[in-house]
Amino acid sequence: MPSKEIDINQKKNVLPKPEDIQLIICDVDGTLLGPDHKPHPRNLRALKYLRENYPQLPFVLATGRQRTSVGNIREALGLHVFPCVHLNGCVVYDKGEIVACAALKNSLAIDIIDKLKDIQTCALFGYDEDYVYQIKQESDKKQHGIKFLRLCGETVKDDANEMLPQLKGPKDIFNKMVVFDDDTNGLEEAKKRLAGIPSDEVALTQALPQTFEIIPPNDNKGVALKNILSKIYPSISLENVLAFGDGANDVCMFELAGYSVAIRSGMPVALKAAKAISDVSSAEGAVGEVLERIYNIPPDFN
């Protein structure tokens, strides 16, 4: 039997008791949402149960997306009253107001653009707090990257011409940058070219096989979690946090939270790092399945 299956079977029942959880932080794509980029009915049902029966329990979304792209999810689940983590920890909001924000240095963004500009198959994007800007498109001009990001709900502008001159100004422009390539060889070449940038200037993180993100070195979902506890919920300790995720970019949350659950369909690095693993995939409502077991949600609740 493969070791991954052994890990899943060993970990699927390692779950906390309801009284041990004071905050839940949850990744979005591949975790709360299924492959169709929509929340599974099982997840919606479980979140409804929590909001009705544990209305003071914070449920924090933590995603690489911008805040605008998950507004429909936040409102549908009644999560607008809680903090949220966006751009993989670069921006933290509380009730719509920014409480923590980080950006890549303009000089670094210029260097990254220069290093990646001639990789034919790659698309490159820059993110600020409101929009995604396409800096470079794939050579075949089929715009797979833009189509993918728009499918995920991002507001993408076809080119970054209006933003690039601002990289020469005093205000750092991009909170993060994203490399997209359907060809994994292109992604590996991009990573190789960026490897020479000192680790105290930039960090690379990955949630999906066809893309990776370039973020400030001291900002990720784990750092954002600590910011939320210190600035918004100082009475809650990390040991009473439950984290859900499926990607390499969620491991930093798993390393801090007292309880962590990887989605069964997630990346091997996430499955290895989490204390528990869901019994079903994101396509089957993994978050809801785990919450049903923790909170003993009645089968007839709707």
Swiss-Prot record:
Main location: cytoplasm
Pfam families: Hydrolase_3
Signal peptide: none
Alphabetically ordered keywords of this record: Cytoplasm, Hydrolase, Nucleus
A Gene Ontology cellular-component term: nucleus
UniProt-annotated location(s): Cytoplasm; Nucleus
GO MF annotation: an example: phosphatase activity
Statement: the UniProt record of this protein carries the keyword Heme: no
Gene3D superfamilies given in the database record: 3.30.1240.10, HAD superfamily/HAD-like (3.40.50.1000)
EC number: 3.-.-.-
Lyase recorded as keyword: no
Family the UniProt entry places it in: Belongs to the HAD-like hydrolase superfamily.
Protein name: Uncharacterized hydrolase C215.10
Top-level taxonomy: Eukaryota, Fungi, Dikarya, Ascomycota, Taphrinomycotina
